[in-house]
Amino acid sequence: SSDVCSSDLPPPNPRLSDSITVIASLNDQLSNWRGTPYRYGGMSRGGVDCSGFVLMTFRDKFDLQLPRETRMQAKIGTEIDKDELLPGDLVFFKTGSGESGLHVGIYDTDNQFIHASTSRGVMRSSLDNVYWRKNFWQARRI
């Protein structure tokens, strides 16, 4: 909530504390996976879904184990304000109804995030984009 002063915010996990390193790791992951098609339940080059991409990124780049499903990823860590986002924070969207209508990505920098988009596969998008701004749900720090 907006009445929390920033000193009360949780620091990121130690593995995510150096933003420069985190951004480099996310860029590397994006270049390795960019264009991989979206496939629900997928966890491979043949196709990956949004929470699978997040899980693999945190496992392979930060040695952190996250839950497999978006709805479970939305319960870990601490909710933070959108304007407090740091590289490696998770961004969640409600793009439809019910649990299948949830979407997750990883905040990068400059108001951008990397994710497995249903229409274009693994890519970088902007939080300023009308669609993502309209459907933004919450941000979480791991």
Give the positions of each predicted feature:
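Post-signal-peptide N-terminal segment of Sec-exported extracytoplasmic proteins
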Residues: 8-46
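Conserved catalytic core of Hanks-type protein kinase domains
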Residues: 32, 60, 107
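Structural motif
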Residues: 88-90, 111
